[in-house]
């Protein structure tokens, strides 16, 4: 059998550490959508997030043709927590992470099945909607009003969000998930934006990074979540002054060593090449970073045998770091990788498809409004 380009690169000695082995990463993401290793079993309740990393990773590699899109779309819709006939569970709607509860398979828009322990999870709703858009679905079977009602029920008085209606930790991660959900559904009624903005604003720490909440430690991940949320809202420059933005930029740019770390005096980690790199991109100063050092670090964590990326060199690859490693390389315009939308965390091709979808909804609503006016007159 003829050797692939990746096989030739993998046998090329010193150059193998610095070559991006695209085909191996495609196969790695394919495996993530099939039977997972035992060590992933604890993630069963959030399987939809693993599907997101794999599907968006394949999309970034322009390789979605290797999966059965229709089957995956049906599976994702079966995870939607739909309103019951009496709509008494609206505050619990959204998407669950997998079929672990044994709820009947229902990929339709029919009324849901009442279950005392069934509810959506904010991160699963975010990744579920993202996956559907990545796969080219038009979201016609998403009960948008129910998703937004479920989202509203998760916002707390301080403006942050918890993950599930039963209560959980509440922090900047879920503010970002909520912002993405509202942005994708093109409807910001799912949150009190003023309260969410206030929460982001109060989370700015003494050293000018953003924390998970007020009074906590600045972190690269929470800084991304806060800045990206404001960008999706179109409020970044209203919330922070130019002087404050310059301080945030300085804090972010100081996170680079070779790759990036999330906090001072912590080791670099592959995923921060996206979290911090995307923040710098949104702040329009990514071009001032050292691309070569960042690229070399990311590729030093590449598994040259099975594909994927790890958080550190000589560690096991996983779906999360494989995806964010590729997104980090995309920010530097690596050959063979599509461009990433830094705020929404999907390919720009997917973000453009979403924009077209929003336009079609707007056209449909305008026509319906016009028809109603015509009928009433």
UniProtKB/Swiss-Prot annotation:
One of its GO terms (biological process) is positive regulation of cell cycle. GO terms for cellular component: CAAX-protein geranylgeranyltransferase complex. Zn(2+) binds at residues 269, 271, 321. InterPro entries: GGTase_I_beta, PGGT1B-like, Prenyltrans, Terpenoid_cyclase/PrenylTrfase. The keyword Glycoprotein does not apply. The keyword S-adenosyl-L-methionine does not apply. Its cofactor is Zn(2+); Mg(2+). Binds 1 zinc ion per subunit. Keywords: Magnesium, Metal-binding, Prenyltransferase, Repeat, Transferase, Zinc. Its EC number is 2.5.1.59. It catalyses: geranylgeranyl diphosphate + L-cysteinyl-[protein] = S-geranylgeranyl-L-cysteinyl-[protein] + diphosphate. Geranylgeranyl diphosphate binds at residues 219-221, 263-266, 272-275. PFTB repeats lie at residues 144-186, 193-234, 245-284, 291-333. GO terms for molecular function: CAAX-protein geranylgeranyltransferase activity; heterocyclic compound binding; protein geranylgeranyltransferase activity; zinc ion binding. Catalyzes the transfer of a geranylgeranyl moiety from geranylgeranyl diphosphate to a cysteine at the fourth position from the C-terminus of proteins with the C-terminal sequence Cys-aliphatic-aliphatic-X. Known substrates include RAC1, RAC2, RAP1A and RAP1B. Belongs to the protein prenyltransferase subunit beta family. Heterodimer of FNTA and PGGT1B. PGGT1B mediates interaction with substrate peptides. This is Geranylgeranyl transferase type-1 subunit beta. It comes from Rattus norvegicus (Rat).
């Amino acid at each position: 059998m003829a050797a692939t380009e990746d096989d030739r690169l993998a046998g090329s000695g010193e150059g193998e550490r610095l070559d991006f082995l695209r085909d191996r990463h495609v196969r790695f993401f394919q495996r993530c959508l099939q039977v997972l290793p035992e060590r992933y079993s604890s993630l069963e309740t959030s399987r939809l997030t693993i599907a997101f990393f794999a599907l968006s990773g394949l999309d970034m590699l322009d390789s979605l043709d290797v999966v059965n899109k229709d089957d995956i779309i049906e599976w994702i819709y079966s995870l939607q927590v739909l309103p019951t006939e009496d709509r008494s569970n609206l505050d619990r709607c959204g998407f669950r992470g997998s079929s672990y509860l044994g709820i009947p398979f229902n990929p339709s828009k029919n009324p849901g099945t009442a279950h005392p322990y069934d509810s959506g999870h904010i991160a699963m709703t975010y990744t579920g909607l993202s996956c559907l858009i990545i796969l080219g679905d038009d979201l016609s079977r998403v009960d948008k009003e129910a998703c937004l009602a479920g989202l509203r029920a998760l916002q707390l008085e301080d403006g942050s969000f918890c993950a599930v209606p039963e209560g959980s930790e509440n922090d900047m991660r879920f503010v970002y998930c909520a912002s993405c959900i509202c942005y994708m559904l093109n409807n910001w009624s799912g949150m009190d934006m003023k309260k969410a903005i206030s929460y982001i604003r109060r989370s700015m720490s003494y050293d000018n990074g953003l924390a998970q909440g007020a009074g906590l430690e600045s972190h690269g991940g929470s800084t991304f979540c806060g800045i990206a949320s404001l960008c999706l809202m179109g409020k970044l420059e209203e919330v922070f002054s130019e002087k404050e933005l310059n301080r945030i930029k300085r804090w972010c740019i100081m996170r680079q060593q070779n790759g990036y770390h999330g906090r001072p005096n912590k080791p670099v980690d592959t995923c921060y090449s996206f979290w911090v790199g995307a923040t710098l991109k949104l702040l329009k100063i990514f071009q001032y970073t050292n691309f070569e050092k960042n690229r070399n670090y990311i590729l030093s964590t590449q598994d040259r045998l099975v594909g994927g990326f790890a958080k550190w060199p000589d560690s096991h690859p996983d779906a999360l770091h494989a995806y964010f490693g590729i997104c980090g390389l995309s920010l530097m315009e690596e050959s063979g990788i599509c461009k990433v939308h830094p705020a929404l965390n999907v390919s720009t091709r997917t973000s453009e498809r979403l924009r077209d979808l929003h336009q079609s909804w707007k056209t449909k609503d305008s026509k319906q409004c016009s028809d109603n006016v015509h009928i009433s007159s």
